[in-house]
Amino acid sequence: SFYGSWIDVKSLNKIDKKDLFKKTTEKGEFYFLKKLSKKINTFDLLQEQTPIILDKIQWQKSMKWGNFSLNWARPLKSILGIFDGKNLDFKFYHLKCSNITFVDKEFEEKKKIFKNFKSYKIFFQKLGIIIDQNLRKDFIEKRLKKISGRRNIIIESNNKLLEEVTDLVEQPNILLCKFDEKFLSIPKEILIITMQNHQRYFPTFDNKGNITNEFLVVANNKDLKGFIKSGNERVVEARLNDAQFFWKKNKSQNLVKQVSKLKTMNYFKGLGNYFDKIQRMRKLGGMISDELLISKEKVELSASICKVDLISDLVGEFPELQGILGGYFSEAQGFDKEICQAISEHYFPLGLETKTPKKPFSIALALSDKLDTLVGFFGINQKPTSSKDPYALRRLALGVIRLIVENNKEFKVKDLISYAISLYRDQELKLFNESLQKELTNFLLERLKYYMKEKQIRTDIIEASINSYGIDHINKIYKKAVILNNLINKEAGKDIISSYKRASNILDSELKDKQLELSNAADPAIFKNNFEKNLLKKINELRKYFANINKDENYSQSLINLANSKKAIFEFFDNVKVNDEDKDIKKNRLELLQMLCKTFDNYINFSSIEMN
C-alpha cells in the first residue's frame, strides 16, 4: 500500500516499482514515491505566501492600536522585505512591505533604508547587534562557559532557558552577579526556580554540585556604570527575602497537626477532599508495601503527611515544588530519612525525562498516588480524549509504567485497581463508570506501548508481547520485548522466526476450516523416522526448560534455546512430508507442529512477529 499524498489509479498504473522505496512509519511499512514538483519562482512565492503566514501566527496575548484592525503582540510600524536585492511588494492589513524600517538608535527612532541583506547585516554589526539567532545563541553560550570557567563554577545545561534569553536580547552582554550568602540556607530548588524560572538567570554550582551565591544574567546592553548588575541583584534578593520568610515559617509548622486542614481543601468534584485522598493512599500504599516487603507503618505515615505542603505559603509561591518542599518540611521536623525521600519523590516520574524513584518507600507512595488519581478520574469519566488531556492522566499512567519497569518490579496491578475502586466506595464517593477496570487496564497498556515505542522496539514485537501477558506482567512484557528486539535482526533471531513460521504456516493452513481438532500431544508409537523422534526430543527439552523456570527467567537464554532448535526443525521439514496420505500419521505430525508452536509461545506468541 501507499502512504502519503493521494495517487489516482491512472497515475498508479504508470509507476515503475523500481522507482519506489520502502519506509517504516508508525502505521506500518509503506511504499513511497519521490515526485518532482514544478519549478516555482522563490520571489513570487515569498510575495504571495508571506502575508498568509503572518496572518496565521497565533499569540497568547495580543493587542490592537489606533484605528487599525490588526491584532499583534506589539504595535507594528513597518514591514521590511527584500529578497535577492528586490523589494517584496505586498500588503498586510494597513501595512505595506518595503525596504524601509525604523531603528532605535540611542533612544531615537530613525528611518533607515536598506538595499539588500548585506547592507542590513553590516549596519547592525556596527551597532553590536547579532541578528542571526544561531550566532547570538552561540555567542551567549560561549560567554557563559568562559565566565563560569574563569570563576571555577558550573552552569547546568538548560537549552530551554538558553533559547529563551537568546530571543530576549539582540546585543547580549553576560553579567556575573551575586546574592547574600545567607540565602544559601533556603532549599536549593527555591533558589533555582527563583533565578531560572522567575528571572531567567543562570544559577551556578560548585564542583560538588552545591549551589553558589553567584548567578549569570544575559543583559541586552553594556553595563558601563554597573546599574544593570546592581538592579538584577536587588530584584533577586527581594524575591529571596520573601522565600526565606516563608521557609522559616512553614518548616516549623507541625505536619501531623496540620493534616486535618486538608479536609477544607477540595481534591476534585466527586472525588472528595485531600484528606480523603491521603486516607485512600494510606491503604493502597499499605497493600503495595506488602508486595515490596517493606514496613506498612512507614508507608502509611508517608501517605498521611505527603500532601500537607499544599497548604503552605511556599507551595503557593512555588507550586512546581509540591512534594519536594514536603520532603524538606518533614526532614526539618526529624522524620525518618526514607519517609522524607518518599514524600519528596512521590510525584515522580513526570513524563519520560525526569528521574524515577528507586527506593522501595518512594515507589510505594508514588504508585499509590498515581493509581488513586487514575482510578478516580476514570471512575467519573474525566478521561483523556484523542486531542485533550487536561489532568495529565497519560503522564501519570506513564509514571506507573516507569515505576514498575525501571525498578524491575512486578505488581498485581489488577488487584491494586480493584482495591483502589473499593476505597472510593468505602468513602461513599460514587464512581459511575461501569467499565472502569477494563478501560484503565487498556489505558495503562497503551502507555506501555508508547513507552516501548520510545525505546525503539518494533511494533509487531510490542503487540506480540502485550497480547501474550496481562496487566500484572508489565515488567515481563517489557523485558521480553527488549531482548527479542535486540536479537531479531541477528542470526539467532532469524532462526527463531523462520523455525516458528515453517510450523505455524502449515498448522494455520490445515486448521483454517476447523474440521481437524488437535490435542497438543504427538504419539511416538506411530513415528516413521528419526526426524520425528529428534523433533519431539528437542520439543521435550524446551518444555522441560520452560517448566523449570521460576520467577527469574533468563530471557536471553530462553531465546538462545529456541534458536538452537532450528537444526531439528529444519531437518524435519526437509525430510518429512507432513501431509501424509495416512490420516493418522498426518494428524500425528500436525500434533508435533502444534506442540512446537505452543512450546515457542512460552516466550511470547510469535504468530504476529513478521519475517524480515
Q: Model-found features: residue ranges?
A:
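Amphipathic alpha-helical "coupling" segments that flank catalytic cores
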Residues: 1-612
